[in-house]
Regions:
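Short, internal strand/loop/helix patches
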Residues: 94-117
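Thiol-/selenol-based redox modules, centered on thioredoxin-like
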Residues: 134-179
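Typically the conserved alpha-helix immediately C-terminal to a functionally engaged Cys/Sec
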Residues: 54-72
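Structural microenvironment flanking redox-active thiols in thiol-disulfide oxidoreductases
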Residues: 73-90
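A short, hydrophobic beta-strand/beta-hairpin element that forms part of a small beta-sheet core
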Residues: 113, 121-137
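Bacterial Sec-dependent N-terminal signal peptides
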Residues: 1-22
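Short active-site neighborhood of thiol/selenol oxidoreductases, capturing the structured segment around
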Residues: 38-52, 77
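A short beta-strand-turn-helix
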Residues: 24-42, 71
């Protein structure tokens, strides 16, 4: 009986290990460096420590093996704390968070890089092109299915063809019909 329970628990644990895939998160500085030798679009997950939907997106979306594999293969993935204390060197300009209060357990001051990107809600995903120019911010929790649409939109540069809400709806409709 004990051996059977051990076997079942081992199977469950090993199944969870197979299902869980880690995104190779790097800094924006590292992504800019890698762009020089192997250009890829960048996806930046902008989060805060207190944000519940941010934590859910980490758990449910970014730990999804299909999403993680797609990100690792097609993008440089950057994770950035919108209220953190780290300095950011983006395109030769230094951004920091002068209002950061150490030891704060809730909300903190917004980082200047977050402000530069025009991000005011969390979670927000910002896509950058291969020249590290911001393309678009997507604010709000995204499921694996929802983020997949955006990942393909930006990987395949289809966003360049979208000029209106109708164009975007058409893209989604065409994308879903292929699935």
């Amino acid at each position: 009986m004990v051996l059977t329970r051990f076997f079942i628990l081992s199977l469950i644990f090993s199944f969870n290990l197979v299902q869980s895939q880690d995104v190779n998160w790097i800094t924006i500085e590292k992504a800019q460096e890698l762009q020089k030798t192997n250009p890829k679009n960048i996806i930046m997950d902008i989060y805060t420590d207190w944000c519940g939907p941010c934590k859910l997106m980490d758990k449910n979306t970014f730990q999804n093996s299909d999403v993680a594999n797609f990100l690792n293969e097609n993008f440089y993935a950057v994770k950035f704390n919108a209220e953190g204390n780290s300095s950011v060197n983006y395109k030769g300009k230094l951004y920091d968070n002068p209002g950061f209060k150490k030891g704060t357990s809730g909300r903190n001051s917004s980082h200047n890089f977050t402000r530069y990107l025009g991000v005011y809600g969390y979670p927000t995903i910002v896509f950058f092109d291969v020249n590290t120019n911001p393309i678009a911010p997507i604010t709000g929790y995204l499921t694996p299915t929802q983020i997949e649409i955006y990942l393909n939109l930006f990987r395949d540069k289809k966003y360049l063809e979208i000029k209106s809400q109708e164009d975007f709806k058409k893209f989604i409709s065409e994308y879903e019909s292929v699935l």
